């Protein structure tokens, strides 16, 4: 008998990958209606705590991959990177994308775009180049984790569970990370609230925009009320 809370796992579009330690990442793959082997791929990375099931979002002209990061403290997410400073979640995400491409029979030059919100925005920026994305849309992304006002307002324990107690600053602050990326960066679409949590806009999205300006990297910025 299927437990009701896990009933979504019986969906024929739902699959999983696992690593050598038995850690599993579940995902839903919704193929495009026409020519999925050549259709672009849209990878959706959810935010903190949105882990009850993969989104049912689909597009007729796009292949949609919707994984779940239910790792980290309380199973609410590990920022699409890992647990206690490892990179296990990041590696599983790469396996999800690779398995999806194999199932779709995707062409080698298939287009990949990533959308992520909040925690997912961090994950989209972090994993964009590694996954070969041409564009990343990050909605209200976290850029700096530990040491930010957002961290001190209640998120510190979740960040520590993902990054460890002595985090690598390359991954604690994506302003540092993006400067280490070799090769071409994706086109960044950044969306931020005009009025949000204290210091969030300036410490997060706007600090990243300053870094992109410094690096002379192209981007699109949208500030919404």
Question: Where does each model-flagged region fall?
Answer:
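Alpha/beta-hydrolase fold nucleophile elbow
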Residues: 106-118
């Amino acid at each position: 008998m299927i437990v009701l809370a896990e009933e979504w796992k019986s969906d024929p579009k739902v699959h999983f990958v696992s690593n050598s330690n038995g850690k599993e990442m579940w995902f839903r793959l919704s193929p495009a209606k026409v020519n999925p082997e050549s259709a672009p791929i849209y990878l959706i990375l959810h935010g903190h705590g949105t882990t009850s099931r993969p989104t049912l979002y689909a597009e007729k002209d796009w292949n949609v991959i919707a994984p779940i990061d239910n790792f980290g403290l309380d199973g609410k997410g590990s920022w699409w990177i890992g647990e206690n400073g490892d990179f296990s979640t990041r590696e599983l995400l790469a396996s999800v994308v690779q398995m999806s491409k194999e199932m779709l029979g995707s062409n080698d030059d298939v287009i990949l775009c990533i959308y992520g919100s909040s925690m997912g925005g961090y994950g989209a920026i972090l994993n964009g180049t590694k996954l070969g994305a041409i564009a990343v849309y990050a909605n209200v992304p976290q850029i700096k984790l530990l040491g930010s006002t957002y961290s001190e307002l209640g998120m510190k324990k979740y960040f520590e569970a993902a990054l460890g107690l002595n985090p690598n600053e390359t991954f604690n602050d994506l302003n540092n990370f993006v400067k280490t990326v070799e090769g071409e960066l994706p086109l960044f679409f950044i969306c931020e609230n005009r009025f949000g949590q204290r210091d969030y806009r300036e410490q997060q999205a706007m600090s990243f925009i300053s870094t992109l300006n410094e690096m002379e990297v192209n981007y699109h910025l949208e500030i919404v009320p």
